[in-house]
Amino acid sequence: MYTHVDVVGIAEASAALYVQKDRDRYLDVLTAIENFIYQHKCIITGESAHLLFLKKSIYLYECYSNNVAEHSKALATLLYKLDPEYLTRYTVLITKVPNQSYVINVDQREFVRLYAIPAVKEHLPIPILPFHCTSALTQQELFCLGPELQLIQIYSKLCNPNFVEEWPTLLDYEKNMRTLFLEQFSQRLEMTGGKKEEEEKHKSIIKKIILEMVSTRQRIVVGGYIQKNLYNHVVKNRNRLQLITSLNIYEEKEIIQQFCDSNGLKIKIRINNPLLPTNPELRRLTIYFNNNDDQSYLIVDMYNTGSYELVPTNEVNTLDGSFLIGTPFVQARFLLVEIWVLMLIAQQTKKDTKKIIQFFINQYETLMNGPWPSMEALFPSSSKRYLGNYVDPNALIKWAQLKLKRIPLFYPGRPDEEE
């Protein structure tokens, strides 16, 4: 009998209808949330931003706020007052981390997650270049993270086995978001051409430094110099090497400085913050080689991602030896980090970075449009293929909660709270 009746299809259709009817009960709640986000210029992030870009319905809003404690309390009070005798009677504000992270539940359902904008240092928030997107629900122009930041978030999860259940959905988001990203960038920046790469005069010395950088299994290649061997010269070569380290970034600085000093190599090392709002822990170590004419060549960018994340890798053999290289999603993630940094430079210094951004976009497009490797190369199943250190985000939240004063749940309907 079951071969002639689409039992699963009928069940799915019935369930979808029931779920939609159930969600429609909260239409006023969702509308009030979007109006609040619009009025207070909150910036939508996470999966909410993906759905906003794709003109789909949102049922859980994740937002950055420039006044997160006050905004979360005001929004919880607003939602309670919508229908205090019935649907929104049980509205509660949960403080995850004081002045950093809050959750609002209505009728025992999670509707809002509000985050403080990460700070470069105290009282100096990381700059965010938000986009405007039209909401499918209220038709208002809402702020959200740009597609480059959303793609960085997506690639980060596609590299993390903790999100394996979300991978099918994330792959759909990635495809759509990548299309939007490539379309809007050429229009917004009106880019043409790419940056011409000059031949370096000190290739042998630079190559010596670069090969030392990739000689240890504590570092992973994510782009630049080595790519010419990986992609048979399809990806245009840059003499800069991009790496991820699993060591502390300041330990790396000492190790590299000692190697170069012992070999009589003149270098400068700088450590900076790429100002990535979705990844405030990220730091970048940059190595410059100095020749006898006091000219500097940027030869290595090293990120500290492996010191707090597990990074999936593949081992490859090239003309220069055998190295660990990040999976395609890891490489795509850090190409977009480069693009983000250049966008910030353009905004803050008014420098023309169009050509170099186009160069990285061309690399990104070539990488993502090229022949895809095997499933094992995209999503390694062996723990030996992951390098770095895993830090449980829930443990970090609990650790932060222990160090800070505990704040009880806020119920907008309580008379003592209203007083």
Swiss-Prot record:
It comes from the Viruses. It is found in: Virion. Induction: Expressed in the late phase of the viral replicative cycle. Keywords: Late protein, Virion. GO terms for cellular component: virion component. Belongs to the asfivirus K421R family. This is Uncharacterized protein K421R. It comes from African swine fever virus (isolate Pig/Kenya/KEN-50/1950). The lineage of its organism: Viruses, Varidnaviria, Bamfordvirae, Nucleocytoviricota, Pokkesviricetes.
